[in-house]
Amino acid sequence: MVAAANPIAFDWRRATADDVFTLAALYRDAALRLGPLVYTPEQVRAWASFADDEPAFRHYVLHADTWIAERPGDGRMLGFCGVATEGDVREVHSLYVAPNCTRRGLGTEMLRRTLERADAEGATRFAAWVTPFSRPVFQAVGFALTQTVEAPFAGVMFERYRVERG
């Protein structure tokens, strides 16, 4: 289980089109600052480059039911989590935390709130393709590993994990 040493208080709201640019910056920052811990420089560049594809990133955020964690008072974005319905499964598309907020339970709490909202809407099955960073967070809320694959992203190979719950 992922433990929160210093839990971060946050406000929770649905993302809008006006948030896409700021979310892309948070995504890019996470990829560039955290990526080198587990990825090669080529993988880090590929991962971060997605934030620069404005139409694709906009779709990534707005196609899913994406929620934003903001610091109370000043509204600074701390992270975001998005889930979309794909058949009878709710697919978690995104879970990103600002690099200065990691290892404090924020990712786990954002994912938990996202799943609770979907549960309240009748969802019973969840799945996600996750990275080495997010896999422990998903496992902390009951997801189990079902598959490991090597898959290309922006022309670079990455190891990805399929996790499912329910």
PLM feature spans:
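Acetyl-CoA-dependent GNAT
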Residues: 3-6, 14-17, 25-100, 111-113, ...
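Conserved G/P- and acidic residue-centered "switch" motifs that form tight phosphate/ATP-binding loops
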Residues: 105-107
